[in-house]
Amino acid sequence: MNYIPTQTFYGRRWRPRPAFRPWQVPMQPTPTMVTPMLQAPDLQAQQMQQLISAVSALTTKQNVKAPKGQRKQKQQKPKEKKEKQKKKPTXKKKQQQKPKPQAKKKKPGRRERMCMKIENDCIFEVKLDGKVTGYACLVGDKVMKPAHVKGTIDNPDLAKLTYKKSSKYDLECAQIPVHMKSDASKYTHEKPEGHYNWHHGAVQYSXGRFTIPTGAGKPGDSGRPIFDNKGRVVAIVLGGANEGARTALSVVTWTKDMVTRVTPEGTEEWSAALMMCILANTSFPCSSPPCYPCCYEKQPEQTLRMLEDNVNRPGYYELLEASMTCRNRSRHRRSVIEHFNVYKATRPYLAXCADCGDGYFCYSPVAIEKIRDEASDGMLKIQVSAQIGLDKAGTHAHTKMRYMAGHDVQESKRDSLRVYTSAACSIHGTMGHFIVAHCPPGDYLKXSFEDANSHVKACKVQYKHDPLPVGREKFVVRPHFGVELPCTSYQLTTAPTDEEIDMHTPPDIPDRTLLSQTAGNVKITAGGRTIRYNCTCGRDNVGTTSTDKTINTCKIDQCHAAVTSHDKWXFTSPFVPRADQTARKGKVHVPFPLTNVTCRVPLARAPDVTYGKKEVTLRLHPDHPTXFSYRSLGAVPHPYEEWVDKFSERIIPVTEEGIEYQWGNNPPVRLWAQLTTEGKPHGWPHEIIQYYYGLYPAATIAAVSGASLMALLTLAATCCMLATARRKCLTPYALTPGAVVPLTLGLLXCAPRANAASFAETMAYLWDENKTLFWMEXXXXXXALALLACCIKSLICCCKPFSFLVLLSLGASAKAYEHTATIPNVVGFPYKAHIERNXFSPMTLQLEVVXXSLEPTLNLEYITCEYKTVVPSPFIKCCGTSECSSKEQPDYQCKVYTGVYPFMWGGAYCFCDSENTQLSEAYVDRSDVCKHDHALAYKAHTASLKATIRISYGTINQTTEAFVNGEHAVNVGGSKFIFGPISTAWSPFDNKIVVYKDDVYNQDFPPYGSGQPGRFGDIQSRTVESKDLYANTALKLSRPSPGVVHVPYTQTPSGFKYWLKEKGSSLNTKAPFGCKIKTNPVRAMDCAVGSIPVSMDIPDSAFTRVVDAPAVTDLSCQVAVCTHSSDFGXVATLSYKTDKPGKCAVHSHSNVATLQEATVDVKEDGKVTVHFSXXSASPAFKVSVCDAKTTCTAACEPPKDHIVPYGASHNNQVFPDMSGTAMTWVQRMASGLGGLALIAVVVLVLVTCITMRR
């Protein structure tokens, strides 16, 4: 069957009904049935009917407020008759005539009233044996009932329908009868995040989950619908999962094309099943014991035995409540006093305490059983043997506490109760055996009170209390102002909880004082108690008595007497033996449950920040030890963390990739470095060198050193070549006696005076004799140098390399093809492409990643948490032996010790000296805190990337979500886009990860069933409630000390608590590429790594035809200001002419610059200003506006701010970029040096050639 209902409606029954009319309304005649094809709907009649209904409702409201008139008095009696006659019709009419709720109940709010009004027709109760177990809902054209709800629908028409069951959706579905279609509700698949309505108030919808405050829903609500503000059904409730302060709902809901079922982890079905208990092989509802009016007050011992027989049944607590309150079948309101009712069936006890405050052993009435410190806010829950909030009769008394004094229960003032560690603790709550208190750090814990005789009774145990801080600051006093962080605390409520303690029938208490010796006989003084005695003198001196009894011819040493009482329970303490080996027990709720709350923590003083060049200096002023950490946002995070407890100064290196630091509980701060420097890229050579030295010191030193070396080598080579040429010219004349050196050669080779005229004489001779030769001789060298310089300059201009480092846009090509592109996987970095299509005006496409989520596929191996050691009361077999039996408990240990001789406060527990045995047991279980504080061990597999991408083209500007896998297609404005797969298959998660609260750790944990004591995974289970618990804690039982009833044992401390102290930094603080690690589900957000290929199909309708677009001419560009390596730090003015105003796409066709604008509004003969970002000091890039193109040339200056809180919108440079001015100076230097070298080469070649001809 299709589980998507059809939206078919004939009217809405949940609209405001017509108000009651106090006057008689005549019956309207039944209209004649007309075939719908022949009868058109009369719109005017419908409008008139609506108007009449509105006027009637308004008139009724006025009549209600009017004083009683004659007409109203006349109609009062007929009204009563009419109501009496209307009490019989169908169930639907009964529902309309329901009496108003009792005044005691809380008035429902607006949401509840709205839902009740809608639910009045569209939901029906499902009943089993007369009890409501859930609901069925009419949605669209179908009736839907949760499959797990047992029973039949309380409507004869719906009950006889044939339902089809779907185990996948946990639904049973059938077609609604035609006559009931008007009662159905609409449904919708539209679910924007926000608040919705249901029977119990508001439902919050966020991140695909419906949640409610814990306690707002309960078993029996299965099948209830959730409505939006228009009264449409958005989901049907199936159950819930308790997550602390809120409960996540398990629902069936609809998407656009299908039905989905959302089932949070730990979901429980909310069907109100009927709980059954047993009594003498007879079943009965647990809430209604068959022995009415019997209850605990009338038959205490029989009632306790009945409870022990049903202790493991689901309805045990209903049976316990019914037995203790002795209520009749009508349900009473619960109160705080009723929470204490169960304690009337229990009693305090005396237990062994190793240190009763004075360093000596005693049997203390306030013995400390357990100290629980699971609350992260430092609160302790202490269990003692006394009972607080009760008087000695067992009734609730907030100012009293009761304790055991011998065989009797006494009471004292609660105000005398004290708890100490290194100083007095602050007690916040008490109930029964439990105390909740805040204590200062210490190495022991002591509880004490003053008894009825003003004597101090105490017990002291060794316990190290050193609570871990909440957050990142170790504060002592809770601040007035701060920030709220999630934490756990013991909720100060005495209401029943999921936690429980075991109770058992107490043993017989030996008391030697009951025996007295009189004239060779032993007298047993009962004193109104039941005494079990055993005397070895004579025969048949064994039994019980409630009256005084005398044993003739006997001695006290031959008798053993003990008080027996089985009409009360006592806590199953390892310091008190149990009555029998079968360990019959009961259970009692534990107050003050651990719950998720928020704790106010301080905010560290903001540090003094000084920004420097590629570094930031923080001056930290901690008021208490405060955590300071930082990491790089690049591929190698280099995490650093420390606790600072005094004034400190820290210098953090900041790179262009960015860093993130966090001080205390302040939010993390991200900073990026900019390419700031001294000097100017367009100044004199020393300013240019200073500029590049600030950016690239090593490269600048290398370049300047290389250039200087080349210049020196060039000059040296020039001088060497000229000297060689001179030597070759003069050598022949030097070897020939009387030879005369020619004038020209003498001038070129600087011949000696003896062989040639001086330069002045030669030049004077040429001036007198031949002036033409004089000018040719003087200008020859200058002409050669000028010619050489021109040649070198032309050569350099032709071969001038483009800037080594251009703006790469993180690997994205500026010119995208029509159907493919590659965008950077960097949040906030815009990718732009210019798309041209014949007959259409060019269009700019902009793609920008808004958010990215990398979610691994996880397989939960197990959960681990803190364990608790369960030590049942030991069983002591007097004058006999006992045997251990195997039990299905984790890490179960059992041993029998012979030859024990235990004592209790009243004397020896056993009559025999050496034939006694003690059976000691212990096993491991999950601590009660595991529901709130546990770690999950996962195996992580292939991660899938889901990205939120903003797509802009033409008039479309839309954000969409897509899976980056190369298959998932999204439609935006009629265009189809397919993203992925991503270029880099990278994930910050290892194969094994551990999730603890909101932190994720890469950790190699042991597999299931292989845990080691004291290490992570010493206890393991699939869920926090599953029965497959594995434990390995090195639990070993020890022999009890002589004369003491106790169960000593040794055990390795919790591996989970050890792991919490040694776990180190989480992946949240050291993930590379700036990833933000989140949980629920586990994912890495906004990782700046890799590129995303995009395939797209853009229809022609997205383009503007050429004839419709403005024709732009005379386009020119003038850069007003330019700051390179800054986020859109340059401004350019485009001047143009156009034939008509309109919108034009503007785009940069070069990778050197990225424009901020995608489209501009053009006007006739106007100008437009655009912003661009460039990493080059001398960018030159082509810009197009519609079909016109021009070139923008700029001379950019370096940025002024060293550090900024945002990343640049361009790629950082890897190789130094040469400015135009720097290239000009290089050309000039190269021309000069090259000219000198070329002259030297020419001279040397000529001289060599002439010499070789001789």
UniProtKB/Swiss-Prot annotation:
Sequence segments annotated as region (Interaction with spike glycoprotein E2): 164-169
Residue ranges of the region described as Ribosome-binding: 108-122
E1 fusion peptide loop: annotated span: 900-917
Any one GO BP annotation for this protein: symbiont entry into host cell
Residue ranges, annotated region (Interaction with host Mxra8 receptor): 360-363, 396-398, 518-521, 550-556
Name of protein: Structural polyprotein
Domain text: Structural polyprotein: As soon as the capsid protein has been autocleaved, an internal uncleaved signal peptide directs the remaining polyprotein to the endoplasmic reticulum.
S-stearoyl cysteine lipid modification positions: C1249
Keyword hit for Membrane: yes
Glycosylation sites: N281, N328, N534, N596, N957
EC identifiers of the protein: 3.4.21.90
Gene Ontology CC annotation, any one: host cell plasma membrane
Keywords of this entry: Capsid protein, Cleavage on pair of basic residues, Disulfide bond, Fusion of virus membrane with host endosomal membrane, Fusion of virus membrane with host membrane, Glycoprotein, Host cell membrane, Host cytoplasm, Host endoplasmic reticulum, Host Golgi apparatus, Host membrane, Host nucleus, Host-virus interaction, Hydrolase, Ion channel, Ion transport, Lipoprotein, Membrane, Palmitate, Protease, RNA-binding, Serine protease, T=4 icosahedral capsid protein, Transmembrane, Transmembrane helix, Transport, Viral attachment to host cell, Viral attachment to host entry receptor, Viral ion channel, Viral penetration into host cytoplasm, Virion, Virus entry into host cell
Catalyzed reactions per annotation: Autocatalytic release of the core protein from the N-terminus of the togavirus structural polyprotein by hydrolysis of a -Trp-|-Ser- bond
Active-site residue numbers: H148 (charge relay system), D170 (charge relay system), S222 (charge relay system)
Motif (Nuclear export signal): 153-163
Residues annotated as site: Involved in dimerization of the capsid protein: Y196, N229
Region (Transient transmembrane before p62-6K protein processing): 729-749
Top-level enzyme category: hydrolase
Region Interaction with the capsid protein, annotated ranges: 724-728
All copies of domain Peptidase S3, residue ranges: 122-270
Post-translational modification comment from the UniProt entry: Structural polyprotein: Specific enzymatic cleavages in vivo yield mature proteins. Capsid protein is auto-cleaved during polyprotein translation, unmasking a signal peptide at the N-terminus of the precursor of E3/E2. The remaining polyprotein is then targeted to the host endoplasmic reticulum, where host signal peptidase cleaves it into pE2, 6K and E1 proteins. pE2 is further processed to mature E3 and E2 by host furin in trans-Golgi vesicle.
Biased composition (Basic residues): 84-110
